[in-house]
């Protein structure tokens, strides 16, 4: 399942790779795989995150209503279609502002059921959220509470495709399908993800508005005091804020759009306090 947000494109490539492999080896398919590549087609066509003209986030109207407005009617149809499935994977990219390491996100009230699946997904990181912070109008929340185990993956950045991230998740999906008996092939070797809870994540934000210039080439392991980047003031030729890691750990979210305003997210760092 992907395409809920029209500016999240990694899922398009993931669906392409899955269909390509299914078509290449139909004899290996031992179950039913339903693929929803674009549940917000108007958003994808116009490159907008929400549903055009309605200014509405598609991932805020589930489980929908058969007698409701257009978006609610579509959401209800999607839910009805998926009910009874053994598993659903909701694939997202980040927005246009930050880049995300391939990760699986699950609620703490569903982690006992979902964590074994999440570990098979070939993600680098599994982030376990407090259920209090999760909106009950999302697809994943609705399906989990209706009895369909649902994982949420996040990767890359909005309006872009990162093929390496996509291929990693595709390998994870086929690994998961092999373990579930849906795909008749040897399970793939996958990453052993870092498991984090919300309390182990530090949010680094901009103290003032300016231009962010990254000092790290990529996300991954860092040490305490590592120079992550600077927020600069071009007119005065000065550094407004030097941003360093407060802990040993990994950066799994990093600013992509250089223009920042006070309070904007620069990075998320997992590690000890």
Q: Where do the protein language model's features map onto the residues?
A:
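Structured catalytic-domain cores with a bias toward divalent-metal coordination
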Residues: 1-273
């Amino acid at each position: 399942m992907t395409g809920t947000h029209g500016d999240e494109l990694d899922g398009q490539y993931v669906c392409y790779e899955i269909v390509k492999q299914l078509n290449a080896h139909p004899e290996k398919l031992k179950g039913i795989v339903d693929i929803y590549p674009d549940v917000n087609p108007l958003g994808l066509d116009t490159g907008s995150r929400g549903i055009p003209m309605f200014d509405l986030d598609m991932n805020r109207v589930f489980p929908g209503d058969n007698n409701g407005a257009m978006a609610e009617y579509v959401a209800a149809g999607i839910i009805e279609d998926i009910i009874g499935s053994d598993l659903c994977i909701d694939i997202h990219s980040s927005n246009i502002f930050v880049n995300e390491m391939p990760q699986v996100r699950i609620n703490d009230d569903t982690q006992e059921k979902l964590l074994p699946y999440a570990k098979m997904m070939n993600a680098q990181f599994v982030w376990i959220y407090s259920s209090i912070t999760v909106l009950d109008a999302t697809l994943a929340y609705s399906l989990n509470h209706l009895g369909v185990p649902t994982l949420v993956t996040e990767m890359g950045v909005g309006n872009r495709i990162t093929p390496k991230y996509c291929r990693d998740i595709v390998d994870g999906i086929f690994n998961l399908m092999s373990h579930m008996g849906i795909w008749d092939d040897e399970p793939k070797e996958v990453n052993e993800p870092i498991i984090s809870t919300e309390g182990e994540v530090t949010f680094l934000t901009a103290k003032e508005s300016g231009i962010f210039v990254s000092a790290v080439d990529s996300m991954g392991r860092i040490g305490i005091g590592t120079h992550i980047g600077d927020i600069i003031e071009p007119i005065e030729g000065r550094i407004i804020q030097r941003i360093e890691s407060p802990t040993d750990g990994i950066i799994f979210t990093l600013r992509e759009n250089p223009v920042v305003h006070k309070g904007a997210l620069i990075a998320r760092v997992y590690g000890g306090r």
